[in-house]
Amino acid sequence: MAKFIMVVGTSSNSGKTVLVAGICRILANKGYKVAPFKSQNMSLNSRVANEDGEIAVAQYTQSLASKVEPSIHFNPILLKPMGNFVSQVIVQGAPYKTINYNEYREDKEYYLTKIKESLEYLNKNYDFVVMEGAGSCCEINLLGDDIANLRIAELSNADAILVSDIDRGGVFASLYGTVELLPQKWKKLIKGFVINKFRGNAEVLIDGYKKIEELTNIPVLGTIPYSEELELPEEDSQALQNKKVFGNINSPVEVNVVRFSKISNFTDIDAFSKDALIKFIDFKEDITGDILILPGTRCSTVEMDLMKKYKMDKKIKDFAKKGGIVIGICGGYQTMGKMLIDDTHSEGDIGTIEGIGLFDMETYFGNKKAIVNSNGILSIKDDDFLVNGYELHEGITHSNEKPLIKLNKGFGNKNDGYDGSINIKDGNYLIGTYFHGIFDNYEFRNHIINMVLAEKGHKLITEDNYKDNFEKNINKFAEIIENNVNLEKIFKK
């Protein structure tokens, strides 16, 4: 039987995701088998779990923090926004329906049934389950339909922690207001408060601690100091709205990423963050980098239409002709071909549209979605690399180019044992693949970066700086939590 803990917040972006990851690492380091859990997540960033089903990237990252293999039961309900208030619903890893909010509400009892199934599975197979809420746990206009917060804590008899971000201001009012607005049956589940992102001397908060404890009869478990040095993955495309440039600002290598309107799985790019400067460019902007990445997208035909409208397709062709490295991932790969053929309009209203034309290939839409963890041998110049990735795509690609990867497992271009396309002759350096997570394979990533470094006369890299950086940061954050938050009572079974 597992002990259930839930982290809920006074608002979105209060620190729930990273706090769950940190608690998971603390417990894993103590030798416990730990599962992260989020009953319902809304995100365009997803990964493939062990069962070849989709879960949100946040729960995948939390599974890394937990030192366990990712499972579809860590995120039984995943909502992938498609625009116009419509989302694709993924249930225990598999596509279920594409519906609007009112239709979703009508299916609430079905989703609760699947959530309970996953909770039962976790209860039988783990020592601890550390659950994450969604947004604010007390949106009083939505409480009746909320299946992501304290209703789940009640179902699992979890001890709940309420976290609030003091960097936004009004932390004590947020804590007090949230607790007082909760129904009594859920209020009593809150066992402690955590104040996140505090700058300065925490002693100035002592009077506030005392007052909030007197008012609510709930203790403050601790305060997590703000740290600019911590580097943990972003969860969703919302994080891109205010992000233009990130990564290693001192690197001589610049990676440009086209900011697609329906960008998905942009966490593919994170792997470059230690060794390159990463810059997102809009359709109207010029390409200034050494490497151009066309990322994943929910709708390749829409992005292709927009690229034509703003002449981005021409800019990409010109960049490639000058020897620039162009890499397309999933939907971005599809746009690199001659044609995107959507006679059934499964991608939307646009239908069939010409691609950029970098590859001699065509992609046909309307097939069942491929959801699979994949691996194979990637061949580039004189190097062969064993690479792992995951596929989340509709579309079958017929390519006359040399394939990039000989598959051991996966769907690839058209379920024929090969994935991707590569053209590195006649001054071209064009790469496309359906593998999300391709850059997590450090030998391939370093190969791409080292091409630029060598051309500019810089020292080449040989280490896996990205993976090492994640482990270093999650362990550091776990240590910060242990040093500043009293969780022993929460951990007691």
From Swiss-Prot:
The keyword Ribonucleoprotein does not apply. The keyword RNA-binding does not apply. InterPro entries: Class_I_gatase-like, CobQ/CobB/MinD/ParA_Nub-bd_dom, CobQ_GATase1, CobQ_N, CobQ_synth, GATase_3, P-loop_NTPase. The active site is at residues 330, 436. Keywords: Cobalamin biosynthesis, Glutamine amidotransferase. Pathway: Cofactor biosynthesis; adenosylcobalamin biosynthesis. GO terms for molecular function: ABC-type vitamin B12 transporter activity; catalytic activity. One of its GO terms (biological process) is cobalamin biosynthetic process. It comes from the Archaea. Residues 252-444 form the GATase cobBQ-type domain. PANTHER family: COBYRIC ACID SYNTHASE, DETHIOBIOTIN SYNTHETASE. Belongs to the CobB/CobQ family. CobQ subfamily. HAMAP family: CobQ. NCBIfam families: cobQ, PRK00784.1. Catalyzes amidations at positions B, D, E, and G on adenosylcobyrinic A,C-diamide. NH(2) groups are provided by glutamine, and one molecule of ATP is hydrogenolyzed for each amidation. This is Probable cobyric acid synthase. It comes from Methanococcus aeolicus (strain ATCC BAA-1280 / DSM 17508 / OCM 812 / Nankai-3).
